[in-house]
Amino acid sequence: MSRGKTIRPSYYDEDESSQDELEYTLNKGRSNIGSESDSDVDEMSKISFGALNRAQTKLNKNNQKHKPSSWKENINNSSEEFFDSDSDSDGPPEETSSKDTKKKKNKHAPSESSSKRPVSRIRDIPGLPSRKQQTLHTDIRFDAAYGKADLIKARKDYAFLDEYRKQEIASMESLLKDKKNKLNDDEREEIKLQLQSLKSRMDTLKNRDLENNILSNYKKQQMESFKEGKVNKPYFLKRSDKRKILQKAKFDSMKPKQREKAMERKRKKRLGKEFRQLEFRPTNR
């Protein structure tokens, strides 16, 4: 007749019962190493993870003097991996991929790269736009690698765009003047800004065309006079002379109101320069 399993009622606290379970498992592990029955498996399955963890740490402390350091490291690593893993998950263990990138210990530390791959000459710096994004929508006709761009030739080739710009300016002005259009304040302000930028662009293009015409005409006159023998050698203008000639030509081509505005800006600029020269800092008493 087989003996029945005696179960004693637990009248201890939770800490004391876990300590008793710990001592019981330690004594039983020392006595019955290698022999494991079904009843032992059932009893072990009822023990909490906290008791198992304390048993593992106590075993490690007792066997530190008898085992080499490599064995200790393996035991500690296996126990940490076991108790750090999620105990509630019933699925298979996750596979760690070998292609995982190493994370930096510090964000200011230099980035690490494998020595097995060749390093590219052009590197992407974090925080700055990559070279591929910068050169994705660039026009190769204006690329510096193909030489310096000829602005005069480009202006002649794309002179037809001025007509489209004038039409766009006229349509914007009519849109702003028309009171039937129910435009918000934000939309009206945005149209005004676009109109102002288009007008300023047209003015800069006109000034550039005027400068190119004046300088080209001056060069032609010098070369013609040199060919006719009036001048021993052609005279090429200095920067200061160019500035004076261009300024005079701009003033002649301006309307009276534009001329007054330009003179007012120049006067304010000169006064500001004089005030900056006369400024002084008060002495500290």
Curated annotation (Swiss-Prot):
Pfam families per UniProt: RRP36
Biased composition (Acidic residues): 81-93
Location of this chain's protein in the cell: Nucleus, Nucleolus
GO terms under biological process: maturation of SSU-rRNA from tricistronic rRNA transcript (SSU-rRNA, 5.8S rRNA, LSU-rRNA)
Disulphide bridges: none
GO CC terms of this entry: 90S preribosome; nucleolus
This protein's record includes keyword Coiled coil: yes
InterPro entries listed in its UniProt record: RRP36
Region (Disordered): 1-20, 26-137, 247-285
Coiled coil: 165-209
Keywords: Coiled coil, Nucleus, Ribonucleoprotein, Ribosome biogenesis, rRNA processing
Broad class of the protein's primary localization: nucleus
Record's compositionally biased regions (Basic and acidic residues): 249-263
Role: Component of the 90S pre-ribosome involved in the maturation of rRNAs. Required for early cleavages of the pre-RNAs in the 40S ribosomal subunit maturation pathway.
Record family assignment: Belongs to the RRP36 family.
Assembly notes: Associates with 90S and pre-40S pre-ribosomal particles.
Protein name per UniProt: rRNA biogenesis protein RRP36
Organism: Candida dubliniensis (strain CD36 / ATCC MYA-646 / CBS 7987 / NCPF 3949 / NRRL Y-17841)
Lineage: Eukaryota, Fungi, Dikarya, Ascomycota, Saccharomycotina
